[in-house]
UniProtKB/Swiss-Prot annotation:
<dbReference type="GO" id="GO:0016879">
    <property type="term" value="F:ligase activity, forming carbon-nitrogen bonds"/>
</dbReference>
<dbReference type="GO" id="GO:0008616">
    <property type="term" value="P:queuosine biosynthetic process"/>
</dbReference>
<dbReference type="InterPro" id="IPR014729">
    <property type="entry name" value="Rossmann-like_a/b/a_fold"/>
</dbReference>
<dbReference type="InterPro" id="IPR018317">
    <property type="entry name" value="QueC"/>
</dbReference>
<feature type="binding site">
    <location>
        <begin position="8"/>
        <end position="18"/>
    </location>
    <ligand>
        <name>ATP</name>
    </ligand>
</feature>
<dbReference type="GO" id="GO:0005524">
    <property type="term" value="F:ATP binding"/>
</dbReference>
<dbReference type="GO" id="GO:0008270">
    <property type="term" value="F:zinc ion binding"/>
</dbReference>
<keyword id="KW-0671">Queuosine biosynthesis</keyword>
<dbReference type="Pfam" id="PF06508">
    <property type="entry name" value="QueC"/>
</dbReference>
<feature type="binding site">
    <location>
        <position position="198"/>
    </location>
    <ligand>
        <name>Zn(2+)</name>
    </ligand>
</feature>
<comment type="pathway">
    <text>Purine metabolism; 7-cyano-7-deazaguanine biosynthesis.</text>
</comment>
<keyword id="KW-0067">ATP-binding</keyword>
<comment type="function">
    <text>Catalyzes the ATP-dependent conversion of 7-carboxy-7-deazaguanine (CDG) to 7-cyano-7-deazaguanine (preQ(0)).</text>
</comment>
<protein>
    <recommendedName>
        <fullName>7-cyano-7-deazaguanine synthase</fullName>
        <ecNumber>6.3.4.20</ecNumber>
    </recommendedName>
</protein>
<feature type="binding site">
    <location>
        <position position="190"/>
    </location>
    <ligand>
        <name>Zn(2+)</name>
    </ligand>
</feature>
<feature type="binding site">
    <location>
        <position position="201"/>
    </location>
    <ligand>
        <name>Zn(2+)</name>
    </ligand>
</feature>
<feature type="binding site">
    <location>
        <position position="204"/>
    </location>
    <ligand>
        <name>Zn(2+)</name>
    </ligand>
</feature>
Amino acid sequence: MKKAVVLLSGGLDSTTVLYLAKSQGYEVYAMSFDYGQRHKKEIQCARDVASGTGAADFVLVTTNMNAWGGSALTDNSIKVPEFNEESEKIPVTYVPARNMIFLSYAASYAETIGAYDIFIGVSEVDYSGYVDCRHEFIDSMEKTINLGTVCAVEHKKYIKIHAPFLYKTKSEEIKIGMDLGVKYEKTWTCYNGEEFACGICDSCRLRLEAFKEAGYKDPIKYKGEK
């Protein structure tokens, strides 16, 4: 069975990608990150998703990106904006070079275990404006990985980065996930790590609108819901 490293945050996108990779016959190795983000709730969700789907392994990487901050997700002094509060510019929830760092770790793990496929749940259609969710970045990272790994340079075994939802809307992604049996109640999207999702941050609003557009009710609980 082919092995694949799946970057798993515990959110909607990465969880759907993991289910998709499994449906395509891959033996899944999940990789998550404790990078000093605002809360750890998503990490537990990632762990639960990996366990519940029978992932071959779950690796948690610790890298303290909060040491330099630069994002509302790694610096508590920066307020998490509400939906559309920064619609014309890159939001303060962008974490500098995060996907570059994550994919570098994934490449190292993949080469070590003999996996030549990496899955990531980025989209350049329905996203918050993050520059590291674009196809130009994904294509460039794949090229860089294959220039800097022995498996590619010496053995001609090239690593492929799969971003299956790169050109899909979040609602299209949810429809695919529903067909795959994704347990969305086990995922966490909110930028805040409280008992219930806030429903007003950019991430929550994109999720809620996507479920509505897809014709489903979001199964997680939101603050203020009865």
